[in-house]
Amino acid sequence: MNKDCIFAAPIEKLGDFTFDENVAEVFPDMIQRSVPGYSNIITAIGMFAERFVTANSLVYDLGCSRGAATLSARRHITQPNVKIIGVDNSLPMVERCRQHINAYQSDIPVEILCDDIRNIKIENASMVILNFTLQFVPQQDRQLLLEKIYQGLNPNGGLVLSEKFRFENKKMDDLLIDFHHQFKRANGYSELEVSQKRTALENVMRTDSIETHKERLKSAGFSQIELWFQCFNFGSMVAIK
């Protein structure tokens, strides 16, 4: 696993964060050291797949990056005639994802598309995964995307939505942000790395509150919505049609 050193040296002109070649190369290390509970969420996605995925259906991993969630789901699918469709708009991510997926043998076909997830038609889905993806979608487009997902899910199908959260209570928000930065420092990131990455993400990652996510999901049509995992200001929700 290549180590993330992208923000280790001072960057004079710090642009917006992008999932480019450099990020794709070190992404597994970056996300493990940056997102509290990430490995737990990936493991649980497999458990959800075991429960949600039905025969003759599709599974969508929207914002699949290098395929960790896709592989976790595929390992736990027991039903016949299932296909997984992974989508990411970063070509470097897609190329590495295809290599990663192809390194493991399985009877379950996986198709990885390089596209904007907003362009994807969701149909005959028993499970949809949005694993730290929605926060990078323009806020004005999030409701419509969730509605498309709901409409494309089969009855009793499930959506797993993992996100970084913000909190309306400023004192609590600041506390959990501090804990997150402490988590990153404990994983070997310097103050400079934490600061520069936060600045780079400011204009591209817009977080929502848990309440906002629940309201959106409810408006999309979901009636069964729960926060099943949280660590500091990161967490994951499940919504069932």
From Swiss-Prot:
A Pfam family matched in the record: Methyltransf_25
Residues that, per the record, bind S-adenosyl-L-methionine: Y38, G63, C64, S65, D88, N89, D116, I117, N131, R198
Keywords assigned: S-adenosyl-L-methionine, Transferase
EC number: 2.1.3.-
Catalytic function, reaction form: prephenate + S-adenosyl-L-methionine = carboxy-S-adenosyl-L-methionine + 3-phenylpyruvate + H2O
Keyword check for S-adenosyl-L-methionine: yes
CDD domains associated with the record: AdoMet_MTases
Record-level GO BP terms: tRNA wobble uridine modification
Subunit structure: Homodimer.
Entries under PANTHER family matching the protein: CARBOXY-S-ADENOSYL-L-METHIONINE SYNTHASE (PTHR43861:SF2), TRANS-ACONITATE 2-METHYLTRANSFERASE-RELATED (PTHR43861)
Function description: Catalyzes the conversion of S-adenosyl-L-methionine (SAM) to carboxy-S-adenosyl-L-methionine (Cx-SAM).
Family under the similarity heading: Belongs to the class I-like SAM-binding methyltransferase superfamily. Cx-SAM synthase family.
Name of this chain's protein: Carboxy-S-adenosyl-L-methionine synthase
